[in-house]
Swiss-Prot record:
This is Transaldolase. PANTHER family: TRANSALDOLASE. GO terms for biological process: carbohydrate metabolic process; pentose-phosphate shunt. It is an enzyme of class 2 (transferase). It comes from Burkholderia cenocepacia (strain HI2424). Transaldolase is important for the balance of metabolites in the pentose-phosphate pathway. Pathway: Carbohydrate degradation; pentose phosphate pathway; D-glyceraldehyde 3-phosphate and beta-D-fructose 6-phosphate from D-ribose 5-phosphate and D-xylulose 5-phosphate (non-oxidative stage): step 2/3. CDD domains: Transaldolase_TalAB. Its main location: cytoplasm. The active site is at K126 (schiff-base intermediate with substrate).
Length: 317
């Protein structure tokens, strides 16, 4: 019997969302993604503490920022030994509103990978999908540095990323689901509001349809899943990045997975492109309470985890 994971791989590029790279081999993902929270989680495990300790030891007299960059590269390098494709490495969330420093950080990370013998074609630089982050991606893409736009919760963010020529976007599913479920409170009905009607699933479907309708080349990678149902409802999306626990559930399941998204079977096609000059971008994002709140919260959480990682490093000096 073919597993749900194997069926999914027929329609979609499967990506592992983890810093715990020892789990990668069993799921055979094409790519992998990391973020500050996942790296923080990994370095607190006994299996990965030696990577943190060695990185600090080798660069003890350098700045904490310098050490964090080397730590990210150390994890990315190990991950790339286990997958055939690309790894995503995230720019510090505290630079989310600073275009120039985001550009500089993206260039620095690519230089470090190249110094480690890894070509830029195997790296995606992750940036928050703020106006400033999108402008940074526009510059980096023109330099041959491919970008993965994260913390993406709305069509206007997706439209702006595509116009900027970003390589890939990561529209979040689970965090959108969380927001709407919390807003609904006791009125939420999983049978009615989940599955194909899940607001997070619908958001990715809308973005996928928009991109394919207007011929954008930017890849759509659904992210932030809470359940296997959210994943299988998006079978056919260009890529899906999935945590090890959900990869495990898909591997253990023999449920039939049917293709749900395809460029040939688009429904509810948009009539026109979204206006995305800076003023309209900011207004449309502000007008969508969920996207505004979740973007702000996501940046705060990633920034807080970056601070925790700095404290771990400083304690080892």
């Amino acid at each position: 019997m073919t597993t749900a994971l194997d069926q999914l791989k027929q329609y979609t590029t499967v990506v592992a969302d983890t810093g715990d790279f020892q789990q990668l081999a069993q799921y055979k993902p094409q790519d992998a993604t990391t973020n500050p929270s996942l790296i923080l989680k990994a370095v607190q495990k006994d299996a990965y503490k030696p990577i943190l300790e060695k990185t600090v030891r080798d660069h003890r007299n350098e700045s904490t920022d310098f050490i964090i960059d080397r730590l990210l590269i150390a994890f990315g390098t190990e991950i790339l030994k286990l997958i055939p494709g690309r790894v995503s490495t995230e720019v510090d969330a505290r630079l989310s509103f600073d275009t120039q420093r985001s550009i500089e950080k993206g260039r620095e990370l690519i230089k470090l990978y190249e110094a480690a013998g890894i070509g830029r074609e195997r790296i995606l630089i992750k940036l928050a999908s703020t106006w400033e982050g999108i402008r940074a991606a526009e510059v980096l893409q023109k330099e041959g540095i491919k970008c993965n736009m994260t913390l993406l919760f709305s069509l206007v963010q997706a439209a702006a990323c595509a116009e900027a020529g970003a390589q890939l976007i990561s529209p979040f599913v689970g965090r959108i689901y969380d927001w709407y479920k919390k807003q609904a409170g006791a009125e939420w009905n999983e049978a009615r509001d989940g599955g194909a009607n899940d607001p997070g699933v619908q958001s990715v479907r809308r973005i996928y349809t928009y991109y394919k309708t207007f011929g954008y080349k930017t890849e759509v990678m659904g992210a932030s899943f809470r359940t296997t149902s959210q994943i299988t409802e998006l079978a056919g999306c260009d890529l899906l990045t999935i945590s090890p626990d959900l990869l495990q559930k898909l591997q253990e399941s023999n449920e039939t997975v049917a293709r749900k998204l395809s460029p040939e079977t688009l429904q509810d096609k948009p009539a026109e492109r979204v206006a995305i000059d800076e003023a309209s971008f900011r207004f449309q994002l502000n007008d969508e309470a969920m996207a505004t709140e979740k973007l702000a919260e996501g940046i705060r959480v990633f920034a807080a985890d970056a601070v925790k990682l700095e404290k771990l490093i400083d304690a080892l000096r």
